[in-house]
A protein has these predicted regions:
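P-loop NTP-binding core
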Residues: 1-270
């Protein structure tokens, strides 16, 4: 059985998709089988990771939207490969916004993904990572949280609004656990876009220590030109420059993630 993690934050631009891509890639490099489910209609994660996004996703009609349009199809039927042999993708497209409106009219709008997550898929992967959009009302966030074991809050140290939005996400998670029966645990928050010796970054880190009662990770992801260049080239930082300092940051964060999960998961093979 796989371990499912949903990345959350109500604010855009905090590095949620970048984290999904690079942590997923680093886990794959460590010989874990990983599936990333891209639930953001911007499809940045899908375009970055997919071997040939236009051919394999758009032309072949293998996206989450196409899966949800069908009545008898499952995750396994729509998974596409990435450039890493251990990392697969359930891709997004610009149509996902319209799909979100569509599933609101279903009799069970919050379990559309759960109903299509097949046993074959769960048994194949060690990790399933859900990359979510920033909108608090998005049904895909509810869908992801319901079938996840953990949620992981991503915070940008250059944007105080990411912290101000936390109570809204806390309410979403409370609703999902109390009203929808989800059993989900927090992972210590990850701070991204960190600038050393920067007053705002220092302030945000100190605020995070107070606000997140389940803690923050020791690892931080620094804000670097190389990270921005790798994103512009539609590559993970490990492909663009695996020796970069920010690549080391993501490696530390991934290792810390595994240690955290080891403490709570008996089924994780380490």
């Amino acid at each position: 059985m796989s371990i499912a993690i949903t990345l959350v934050c109500n604010k855009g631009g905090v590095g949620r998709s970048t984290t999904a891509q690079n942590v997923g890639w680093r886990l794959a490099k460590s010989n874990y089988k990983v599936l990333i489910v891209d639930l953001d209609s911007q499809a940045n994660t899908s375009i970055t990771l997919c071997k040939d996004y236009e051919a394999l996703v758009i032309t072949a009609k293998k996206s989450i939207t196409e899966m949800l349009k069908s009545n008898d199809k499952y995750f396994t039927d729509y998974i596409v490969p990435t450039r890493h042999k251990n990392l697969d993708l359930l891709a997004s497209s610009w149509e996902l916004d319209m799909t979100e409106s569509m599933i609101r009219n279903e009799s069970s709008p919050n379990t559309q993904l759960r109903d299509r997550l097949d046993v074959v898929c769960e048994d194949k992967y060690d990790f399933i990572i859900y990359d979510t959009p920033p909108r608090k009302t998005d049904k895909f966030i509810h869908n992801a949280l319901i079938i996840s074991n953990y949620y992981w809050y991503i915070v940008s140290s250059e944007n105080r609004w990411a912290l101000d939005a936390k109570p809204i996400m806390d309410k979403t998670i409370k609703d999902v656990t109390e009203s929808m029966g989800a059993r989900i645990q927090p992972i210590p928050a990850l701070i991204t876009l960190y600038r050393r010796r920067n007053a705002l970054s220092t302030l945000v880190v100190e605020q995070c220590k107070k606000i997140f009662d389940y803690g923050i990770m020791k690892a931080t992801i620094r804000d670097t030109t190389e990270m921005r260049k790798s994103s512009a080239m539609y590559q993970t930082i490990y492909e663009y420059n695996h020796r970069a300092e920010v690549a080391k940051d993501y490696t530390k964060a991934t290792e810390e993630l595994i240690v955290t999960l080891r403490a709570t998961q008996t089924k994780l093979k380490l």
